[in-house]
Amino acid sequence: MVNFTVDQIRAIMDKKANIRNMSVIAHVDHGKSTLTDSLVCKAGIIASARAGETRFTDTRKDEQERCITIKSTAISLFYELSENDLNFIKQSKDGSGFLINLIDSPGHVDFSSEVTAALRVTDGALVVVDCVSGVCVQTETVLRQAIAERIKPVLMMNKMDRALLELQLEPEELYQTFQRIVENVNVIISTYGEGESGPMGNIMIDPVLGTVGFGSGLHGWAFTLKQFAEMYVAKFAAKGEGQLGAAERAKKVEDMMKKLWGDRYFDPANGKFSKSANSPDGKKLPRTFCQLILDPIFKVFDAIMNFRKEETAKLIEKLDIKLDSEDKDKEGKPLLKAVMRRWLPAGDALLQMITIHLPSPVTAQKYRCELLYEGPPDDEAAMGIKSCDPKGPLMMYISKMVPTSDKGRFYAFGRVFSGVVSTGLKVRIMGPNYTPGKKEDLYLKPIQRTILMMGRYVEPIEDVPCGNIVGLVGVDQFLVKTGTITTFEHAHNMRVMKFSVSPVVRVAVEAKNPADLPKLVEGLKRLAKSDPMVQCIIEESGEHIIAGAGELHLEICLKDLEEDHACIPIKKSDPVVSYRETVSEESNVLCLSKSPNKHNRLYMKARPFPDGLAEDIDKGEVSARQELKARARYLAEKYEWDVAEARKIWCFGPDGTGPNILTDITKGVQYLNEIKDSVVAGFQWATKEGALCEENMRGVRFDVHDVTLHADAIHRGGGQIIPTARRCLYASVLTAQPRLMEPIYLVEIQCPEQVVGGIYGVLNRKRGHVFEESQVAGTPMFVVKAYLPVNESFGFTADLRSNTGGQAFPQCVFDHWQILPGDPFDNSSRPSQVVAETRKRKGLKEGIPALDNFLDKL
């Protein structure tokens, strides 16, 4: 299938049971893009000779130069299963041709927002793990996200060539390595998954079922137990039995797969399988996986890499491998590649695993609907999503914007969950802040064109039915990053994506030539569109701030801004870190503030959260949308709150969802409800810009103790109450031992044993501390996990490499907020320097404002 016409693809799109939407996820440099190549070349978009070198999905120039994937790209593949293989599919199917929409996502932590966007539009994930270094921190983060989105994983052990050629492992050691990785992945799945009783059933991976692949993306070969089981079934069948029917054959292969993994042993003397490790006459038996699967592979490697021509020729003949004439003259590694590629082609093994084990939209949307759709579970839109119904109302989620070749326009990239999207269709474009029945963030516009994404190319297409991934033209002006597109009037939004990282590093940018300012502003708008994570902020002082997840992320954003979006030379400041303000004990006095007209008084106190509550709010375990009683019960049980107080939470802040709480513990106050909105507004304002240096507050609980109000409504309007509430909140913070919190990275460093000492040295200089150190079993590598303040992380990588001779590779993920030790009022302390710097940068008055500005006397 080299030449694909759009009409052919369009025909398959209607067979929604035969669509697979999947993403490839993994730790950085475990070989996702390389593997994706062998899939793409099998489905015929790259000429097969170049696979493994092209990295088709790395479409950007900087991706090809840095050899990392930065943005997630989508490609449609087509694969036909043979009659025999169709019997392995346990869900509904429709013909033998399958359309696979594949999204290759980046593995670098700084880009994990890209991964989140990719996960939202897919139903299954191919998790790639390097079998030498095992399951790493990013694999875990991404897999956890996938399971939270109810996405079914299958596993691929990549880089087997390294295990055989570099580490020279014995078959039994290699089996143990695989076994350990499978266990690690299953531990993650069972920790974050919903168990067998959940809506998805059992999603644990198991080589016996064929949900684990083994192979090498670089050399272009791979297999699951199914491939070998088929060879042996055919071999045993040839000895005596005649032809089997397809269904019986599938049954036999499944039985055979059960014997090829785990504690099953093979007795070569009589060709029997046994469950004990010793044969009747006391000999030690080889494990079946080693004897029947690894042994032939080892033999091929051994014969070819030691240049034994006759043995090689015999093996090639025995395995029935047909080489091209040009391959016959090769020797060493090139010949090894050619032989393995012919014998166990990676494309086939992986595409079979994907089509057989990953769910179709029909299967997946049944259990994903409740996570995807915010509205009631029984309205038209929800029913359409659940049944993946092309006749239902159009429901489509845009997960990100993809820049087009002409500067400044974007394709909206997303997935149709119900209905059909077509060129010229008039739709409702709903941004993330849309609420049903209101007009904000809602546009009624026609779609100009629908297009298919093909890696580096796009193809126009008339219409696309549900279950497919598509690009839209002409929607980009109405959405910033994500949104919902629908034709159903009462539709609610599709749920917003939760990112596992937060933008904590910021730089200020300005144009080198002041006349270019309008271009810079325009460029920042485009940048905010093109990256799901980045935040572009204009400070009151007129500074333009870009906030990103880490150093690398920001570097790439700035490069994009300079070259693609604004196209002007740019000056940037040194990166600075966002802080949070908090309190460390309860206010020592009951704070009183009077309104400007002296007729209203508010009394409040502040106190810190119990440990863990702020994190629960971030995760969404406790939120403003929850049912009141359930939330009160949760707070009472887990954090020992008073139930009566827990029920009287007025709001969360900043932005209505942040990790600060305003509770009302007043007794019988007149007119209280009339000023509730004003106090809440003051609270949102105060928590967004704290008292110390106008950073967000975090982990503070404010209690309204008492309120005395003027009887006349006109004297207690918003203009009187809002600033008073804010002053009172500031006073209660300043009397409660305020502190600063700084963001902390979790750093995972892989390195050989001899340089571990160097790592400790670097971390100690940077205020970091190691909390776990372990050896990767079966390899000389150590994994060191440490906490490192984000503030100290600039240039950390370079420092580490120079101190360890380039042998240590760090991965940083934002992990938590931690209180900066020291009192911000003490001039010699670290926090007071930070406060002073931040205030200076923001153009505020020097020094923390005095308490008298906020606290009034009776």
Curated annotation (Swiss-Prot):
UniProt cross-link Glycyl lysine isopeptide (Lys-Gly) (interchain with G-Cter in SUMO1), position: K239
Main location: cytoplasm
Superkingdom of source: Eukaryota
Pfam families: EFG_C, EFG_III, EFG_IV, GTP_EFTU, GTP_EFTU_D2
Keywords annotated in UniProt: Acetylation, Cytoplasm, Elongation factor, GTP-binding, Hydrolase, Isopeptide bond, Methylation, Nucleotide-binding, Nucleus, Phosphoprotein, Protein biosynthesis, Ubl conjugation
An annotated GO cellular component: plasma membrane
Modified residues (N6-succinyllysine): K152, K272, K572
Enzyme Commission number, as recorded: 3.6.5.-
Record-stated family: Belongs to the TRAFAC class translation factor GTPase superfamily. Classic translation factor GTPase family. EF-G/EF-2 subfamily.
Quaternary state and interactors: Binds to 80S ribosomes. Actively translating ribosomes show mutually exclusive binding of eIF5a (EIF5A or EIF5A2) and EEF2/eEF2. Interacts with SERBP1; interaction sequesters EEF2/eEF2 at the A-site of the ribosome, thereby blocking the interaction sites of the mRNA-tRNA complex, promoting ribosome stabilization and hibernation. Interacts with HABP4; interaction takes place at the A-site of hibernating ribosomes and promotes ribosome stabilization. Component of the mRNA surveillance SURF complex, at least composed of ERF1, ERF3 (ERF3A or ERF3B), EEF2, UPF1/RENT1, SMG1, SMG8 and SMG9.
Protein name in UniProt: Elongation factor 2
